[in-house]
Regions:
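Structured, helix-rich domain cores that form ligand/interaction pockets
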Residues: 1-186
């Protein structure tokens, strides 16, 4: 949160910050070791639920450069839980988190779901070379963050529909909710 306040107070974008780092330290004298990118779905009817992502993972109906997945569920209220799905190891070059941001905000700020509204978050965590490469691309194309983020997601993670007649999972069709989500980028 502090970084947003600092940038806003100076009327800087992240692209400005990256360019300033490059000018100050030289192109090869600084390195981004971690970069988190969040995509928020605040549609009343979200593109997908965390439960849908969980089921796709349980059935191994996804293709990813990141290995493994796990789930976390915590009590939200007397009737519901907040869910998180992790794909990939946290220390790997690229990992993903899908979670109920609406329930997190409700718990943190003592608000109701009606006040907050539907809010599902997709996060990509990039480390080391992947983080630095993305930051440098973003520096050169700061107005295209949505396109860059969705492109990274589309090229590295895909939820699929099983096909009994095809043993090669890479030939399976992309599931509808994922196609719709990836097509939702605001340019």
């Amino acid at each position: 949160d502090d970084i947003f306040r600092i940038l806003d107070s100076r009327n800087y974008t992240f692209g400005d910050m990256f360019r300033r780092c490059e000018r100050r330290y030289g192109l090869d004298n600084f390195h981004f070791t971690r970069l988190d990118i969040a995509i928020d779905d605040k549609n009343e009817k979200p593109f997908f639920t965390i439960e849908q992502i969980k089921k796709k993972c349980e059935k191994e109906e996804f293709i990813s450069n990141s290995e493994g997945y796990k789930f976390d569920e915590s009590k939200f209220d007397d009737f519901d839980t907040a869910k998180t799905v992790y794909i990939g190891a946290g220390k790997s070059g690229l990992s993903y988190r899908f979670y109920d941001k609406d329930k997190e905000v409700c718990s943190k700020y003592n608000k109701s779901l009606d006040e907050v509204g539907s809010w599902k978050r997709t996060e990509m965590q990039l480390r080391d070379e992947k983080a630095h490469a993305f930051a440098m691309t973003f520096k050169d194309r700061p107005l295209e963050l949505g396109e860059l983020a969705f492109g990274l997601l589309a090229n590295n993670l895909r939820f699929v529909v099983p096909n009994r007649n095809e043993s090669n999972k890479s030939r399976w069709k992309t599931c509808r909710f994922w196609e719709r989500f990836l097509g939702a980028v605001e340019v």
